[in-house]
Amino acid sequence: MSRYTGPSWRISRRLGVSLSGTGKELNRRPYAPGDHGQGRRQKLSEYGTQLREKQKLRFTYGMTERQFYNLFKRAGKIKEGTHGTNFMILLERRLDNMVYRLGLATTRRQARQLVNHGHITVDGQRVDIPSYEVKIGQVISVREKSKDMAIIKGAVEAVVGRPQYVEFDADKLAGSLTRFPQREELDAELDDSLIVEYYNR
């Protein structure tokens, strides 16, 4: 299954979650797309509820189903912690997500493009793989020739706050993961146990 590249607002409204992180998609029309979206009151089955939760997380991180499931299987091999929490930590450690968390991009989709186009380095080496798994202490920074990009400057200036598990130097446009996040620091509205149930059904 390929990665969805269409309008994110349609998926946001269908799943009831802001994929952009701004919430703008849901402010004006907090219901599913379509002429009768506002009047729908669809009752989901147990499977439907699990599927929707899985899709929320997958689309939030902008991954294909294969990428998502492979990472889920990897999380299941980690001995400490719960499967769901370990899965979410692995998702957070993706390079494109860390670029977003550091505030170098306003959305994960924008962050993924910055990585794909070679604007990001890890420990001084250019890395153009969005799924690259960031380790604690590795320095993520903007390439020297890319530091004047308006899209990056605008993103940094727009940041309101950053997660406590990252540190960032605005002058150097560089930051790092200082520790693994706790489950309560991640999406509190998402029930990761439903995703575990979905794949283990």
Swiss-Prot record:
Listed GO CC annotations: small ribosomal subunit
Can you provide one Gene Ontology molecular function annotated for this UniProt record?
structural constituent of ribosome
Q: Which Gene3D superfamilies match?
A: Ribosomal Protein S4 Delta 41, Chain A, domain 1, RNA-binding S4 domain
Q: Which UniProt keywords apply?
A: Ribonucleoprotein, Ribosomal protein, RNA-binding, rRNA-binding
**Ranges for region Disordered:** 21-43
> Biological process GO terms, please?
ribosomal small subunit biogenesis; translation
Which SUPFAM superfamilies does this entry report, sorted A to Z?
A: Alpha-L RNA-binding motif (SSF55174)
- Pfam families hit by this protein: Ribosomal_S4 (PF00163), S4 (PF01479)
Oligomeric state and partners?
A: Part of the 30S ribosomal subunit. Contacts protein S5. The interaction surface between S4 and S5 is involved in control of translational fidelity.
Q: According to its UniProt record, which protein family does this protein belong to? A: Belongs to the universal ribosomal protein uS4 family.
**The protein's role, per its UniProt record:** One of the primary rRNA binding proteins, it binds directly to 16S rRNA where it nucleates assembly of the body of the 30S subunit. With S5 and S12 plays an important role in translational accuracy.
- Family annotation (HAMAP family): Ribosomal_uS4_B (MF_01306_B)
Fetch the NCBIfam families from UniProt.
PRK05327.1, rpsD_bact
| Listed name of the protein | Small ribosomal subunit protein uS4
In its UniProt entry, the species of origin is given as: Levilactobacillus brevis (strain ATCC 367 / BCRC 12310 / CIP 105137 / JCM 1170 / LMG 11437 / NCIMB 947 / NCTC 947) (Lactobacillus brevis)
